[in-house]
Amino acid sequence: MKFEPKTLDFDLSPYTGLTRESWLEAGRYLLEGIFQNIDDFQKPVVMPRKETEITYPHLKDSQEAQAVQRTAEVFEGLTRSFFIAAPMIGNLPDLTVCGYPMAEYYKNQVLRVCTRGDALYVGTYEDQQEITGHTDPYRTFQQTVETCALVICLWVSKKQIWDTYTQAEKDVIAGFLESYAHASTVPQNWRLFNMLDMAFLHMEGYPIQKDIMRDHAQAILAYYAGDGWYRDGHSFDYYK
């Protein structure tokens, strides 16, 4: 079923008619599409797969590679859906979708993926290196990307989720984030992921390695090509 906004105001929004309420309706529509596939509050956001050749986990890869990919699958499902849920929660703190209170669901899932020993624990950077046998000391992992998504969402829904954790729970999440924030990253726009991790930790009173932050910052400035465009290897990215 396609999305059809119920609220339109062409005086306020002459081209599309879409208003703030329209976007909240769109967010609910997208979340319902996700959560109709989640049959238990404790289960992660892992969508049904149509293929196994292109998207990970790649079933033909080694067991070690699949182990890393499966945790990335859980983490990416959480954080990318959180991109939709976080602003929705910020605007509608009591939002419930498919019977699940969104703030409670994401609060629970975020803590679980960061907690060692939990069935959903996705592992620190050091854990990923251990799984892959330390074959490359500078290896990067998809989880670095997702930590950036996580801190953005925690900031957007700060009052509803982050501020409701106990100090001990915050410390668990911060320790998890710190492992990726200061670890190896791809020497292009991935540097921004590490920077945002460190920025969140710093704003929340956790120590960061400022020399690493400065190094990432000077590199990002060197990538800038003007008018919002940044070099990304042989390509360009636009950031507004």
Where are these regions (language model features)?
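Extreme N-terminal leader/anchor segments
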Residues: M1-T115
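Aromatic-lined, polymer-binding surfaces characteristic
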Residues: V74-F75, A85-M88, G99-K240
